[in-house]
Amino acid sequence: CVITIITRGDNEVLLAKNARNPRPVYGLIAGFVEVGETLEEAVRRETFEEVGIQVKNLQYLASQPWPFPSNLMLAFRAEYAGGDLVLQEDEISDAAFFKFDELPEIPFAGSIAHAMIMHVTQGHAVADDTKAWL
C-alpha cells in the first residue's frame, strides 16, 4: 500500500475523511498498488481517483508493517500540482487543504499517518528505523 501526504505551498496539507469511518478523523490518501504499477504511479493514481488532483515531486519517507491484510505501508510526500478537489464519495466523504496550525482531528499517535503529519507540519524528524519514528 502507498500512503501520501500532500502539501500546498509552505503551510497547507491535504487531509481527507474516510467515508467508512464514523469518527471525525482526517487522514491521508492511501491505497493499494496495482499489478505492473510503480509506487510513484500508484501514488498519482490513488490521489487522482480519491480527490481528483495532480501531484508532483514525490519523495519516499518511510515504511510501516500493516497487519491487515498482511501489507506494508510505503509513505510518500508529494506537492500539489493542480486540479480541483473532486471526491470519490464511496471512499472519501470530505477533503480539504488545512493550515498547519489549524488541523482537524488526525489519526492516533503510533500510526504512520500521524507520524507523517507531525513530520510535515511540526518538523519532526523521520527516523532511519520507522519503528523508532512511530
Labelled PLM ranges:
Residues Q64-L87:
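Active-site-adjacent beta-strand/loop module that shapes the phosphate/pyrophosphate-binding cleft
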Residues I29, V43, T47:
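Hydrophobic alpha-helical positions that pack around
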Residues C1-L28, F32, Q54-V55, A78-Y80:
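N-terminal strand-loop-strand
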Residues E37:
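Surface-exposed, charge/polar-rich loops and edge strands
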Residues E50:
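Short alpha-helical functional segments enriched in proximate histidine and acidic residues
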Residues P22-Y26, Q88-L134:
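Nudix hydrolase/Nudix homology domain
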